[in-house]
């Protein structure tokens, strides 16, 4: 299973996910409330360490944007509060999943992986919609043995 497939399947287990009728890759319909998407932004090599034998441990980080288009009318403070709570809830859920060790794993070492959902914010508004974005990152280690 690819990193994208893992993230997509895992996000679908969020208890509040049912608010999204569709969850796309690299797309979110900003005119239709109740959908979202995951936008992969790549892999970053954070650190590389080599031992005297040439074996290498790499700390990597995958980054994703999670976009959600939710219903919100102009001046609708109640709807805005519900949406903001949803954004906070998914961030707290990701944190809990990471801390309790039930988030998906990507590395091949016994080191604990860290998944973070951060900076959830209103991204854009449209006719009866509001698009929110959360930055998701996964930090993990991979070990490469020289044979």
Regions from the language model: what does each represent?
Residues 33-43:
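A short, hydrophobic beta-strand-centered structural micro-motif
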Residues 1-28, 46-147:
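Charged, amphipathic alpha-helical segments and their flanking helix caps
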């Amino acid at each position: 299973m690819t990193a994208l497939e893992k993230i997509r399947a895992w996000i679908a287990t969020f208890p509040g996910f049912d608010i999204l009728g569709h969850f796309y890759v690299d797309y979110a319909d900003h005119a239709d409330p109740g959908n979202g998407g995951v936008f992969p932004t790549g892999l970053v090599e954070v650190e590389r360490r080599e031992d005297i034998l040439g074996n290498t441990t790499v700390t990597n980080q995958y980054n994703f944007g999670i976009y959600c288009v939710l219903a919100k009318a102009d001046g609708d403070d109640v709807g805005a509060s519900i949406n903001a709570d949803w954004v906070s809830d998914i961030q707290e859920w990701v944190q809990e999943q990471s801390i309790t060790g039930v988030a998906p794993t990507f590395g091949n070492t016994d080191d604990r992986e860290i998944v973070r959902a951060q900076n959830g914010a209103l991204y854009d508004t449209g006719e009866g919609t509001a698009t929110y974005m959360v930055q998701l990152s996964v930090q993990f280690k991979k070990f490469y043995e020289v044979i």
